[in-house]
Amino acid sequence: VFFASLPGHYVSGNLYRPKGRAGKLPAVLCPYGHWPDGRFIWRTDAEIRGEIDSGAEKTPQAARSPLQARCALLARMGCVVFHYDMVGYGDSRKIEHPLGFTDTESVLRLQSFMGLQTWNSIRAVDFVLSLPEVDEKRIAVTGASSGGTQTIALSLADQRLAAVMVSMNMQGGCVCENAPLYRVGTNNVELAALCAPTPQGVAAAKDWTEDFETRGLPQMKAIYRLYGADDRIEGRFFPYPHNYNLHSRQMMYGFFNKHLKLGWPEPVEEKPFEPIPPAQLSVYDAAHPVPSDATDAAGVRRW
């Protein structure tokens, strides 16, 4: 799938649709972080063994492509899933990551990499809502690392979300996670709490988020309590390095099962699937080339 979020700037990604489902279906947006090759992540056999030996993953298929594992199971649970590219990753290559909006003129005009990605996410919501089978009242988003940052940003910018799941949210380590004036006098915990009372789950890892259960979650619960929504905020620490592995995904499956009313038997377990090789995931090929009007950062800035 690809569509223009701005004239000459295209959002690309894969659309997963469940089979044999009637009626209106929930939709889940899946932004991703700085994984090697982005949407096309394809781990080596040695990396797969490491993931399984550490307990982070159970199956070679999910270890090979944990991003596909997430999308495949959500589709099996009855969700329409849009797994879309961050700017400069996957098929979105006209603007190099993380360049493009670091010049003085862009900053003075509050044009930023993060702003463009967030606009892409808003337009991704528009896209899934244009699908006739999607239930407009059951739209969710989930991502890890800078995909978690993008998840928070979308929840702040768009009120159409019914549930939010953040895994290892970043304070900001790249221009795609920082915009001018974004965190002046505040932080990610406070920003994430602004989506209350929308249901929100947070998975923390053995990284800069490892103390979230004691520093972050209590404060977010206090905000949710003001709305009488204590049962809509969850947080859990998993003792693994920065990731969106099986354990974080299982928390997410259960969270969406509850708040999107999927009706899936608990506990939700991943089922075997065959990951699709990167070449087949690509939106563009000889028969379907990149649109001729696709522009770079300068073109987006001019617009």
Predicted feature descriptions by range:
Residues 1-10, 203-303:
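Alpha/beta-hydrolase-fold serine-hydrolase catalytic core, especially in secreted/extracellular enzymes
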Residues 156-163:
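Conserved hydrolase catalytic core segment
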Residues 133-145:
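Alpha/beta-hydrolase fold nucleophile elbow
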Residues 23-24, 29-125, 129, 170-180:
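Cap/lid segment of the alpha/beta-hydrolase catalytic domain
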